[in-house]
Amino acid sequence: MLRIRSLLNNKRAFSSTVRTLTINKSHDVVIIGGGPAGYVAAIKAAQLGFNTACVEKRGKLGGTCLNVGCIPSKALLNNSHLFHQMHTEAQKRGIDVNGDIKINVANFQKAKDDAVKQLTGGIELLFKKNKVTYYKGNGSFEDETKIRVTPVDGLEGTVKEDHILDVKNIIVATGSEVTPFPGIEIDEEKIVSSTGALSLKEIPKRLTIIGGGIIGLEMGSVYSRLGSKVTVVEFQPQIGASMDGEVAKATQKFLKKQGLDFKLSTKVISAKRNDDKNVVEIVVEDTKTNKQENLEAEVLLVAVGRRPYIAGLGAEKIGLEVDKRGRLVIDDQFNSKFPHIKVVGDVTFGPMLAHKAEEEGIAAVEMLKTGHGHVNYNNIPSVMYSHPEVAWVGKTEEQLKEAGIDYKIGKFPFAANSRAKTNQDTEGFVKILIDSKTERILGAHIIGPNAGEMIAEAGLALEYGASAEDVARVCHAHPTLSEAFKEANMAAYDKAIHC
């Protein structure tokens, strides 16, 4: 009794004593990580009858994609495009605007944040609906069959005590983090990652971006529309490393017309803040001529990719294998060295894409239930939500040439598409690659309006081994942008009608 009274009189002692307590729970499946791979796996596991739990330390479900990636960036891209259209196209569309059109940065950011909040809350509701136990806390391996969940300081709703979860099956889905650039310190104010770029409090006069991949080009598009002078520095000789070469060149042409400046085959030597001038000073070097150039920008965005995130997981504690790139090593059934510990999403092999992660989450759980699961890694679409949008799936021309595969090309421009004409949005084309002998579709590449939506038809065709004629003989509604996809397939095996 005296011991209890003394603890109550000493909050610090009481707090430290409470933290030593543990609560033991048992589950059939525990997923560490609540991003696209993790939360989808958790819901699917519960639907298949497993007693399921998900551990997430962010405090909000959805991972990088929903909180500081795909979703907030699309809100900024959409709203900045509307702003740009009103500024540059209203008059030609017969819309007279009286007064200035301005960006209210606070409300611009609020619209983004509202979308994120609604979607993260929606996932929590799905957890409740499917009876998934949700632990807000740090999850780490106690041993190969136990997960320790510890409180996260300052996180609302975090577990109050350590939990030890006794688990039959574990799925690791801890995701990825921003890849740092050697010698450049990110402060998320003047030198920012993609996370900081999503939440700038004012529009910079000049924005320099290190990296000409999807993240950099999307953020460059946003701020270029809002008035920033955007410079993209890319080490490779072309932007969009995984794009078809022809499409990459067309994309650069369209973005350059919108005001983005490109320095290709260029490396960054250094970058540092100069607070006296309120700028970041950047030194770059042309890799062909070795000529150096000094750049200045109010904001520098470092967008050189992402890397697997396993900090605090305790992978080394149980001997999980990690490769040179920091990825957890698995077999073709997502198994680590322990068959009951599976790994999915960005933390392991394959493209770091939310939809790929979701597919793996479902497949891994189905393997637990039935011994079978399916992800077709040759049919994972990619989309860049610039304007025009860029989307692709399957093989590029470069890949087909390297593999020695004979192929034919079918192309159709949006300038010849009736819906694109009515929308006054005609930049770009659809490009189809087919096997010369069988005429099966090998790859599809779209640059143009709504490319991200249209690419789904290409994915379906690839998944079921369709030929170009199979697609061309499907009746497509008129007038729609999807008719351009039909016509490109017609052009691949015969001739397009409207071009």
From Swiss-Prot:
CC cofactor: FAD
Protein's cellular compartments: Mitochondrion matrix
Coiled coil: none
UniProt KW keywords: Disulfide bond, FAD, Flavoprotein, Mitochondrion, NAD, Oxidoreductase, Redox-active center, Transit peptide
Entry's cofactor comment: Binds 1 FAD per subunit.
SS bonds (residue pairs): 65-70
SUPFAM superfamilies linked to this entry: FAD/NAD(P)-binding domain (SSF51905), FAD/NAD-linked reductases, dimerisation (C-terminal) domain (SSF55424)
Name of this chain's protein: Dihydrolipoyl dehydrogenase, mitochondrial
Source species taxonomy: Eukaryota, Fungi, Dikarya, Ascomycota, Saccharomycotina
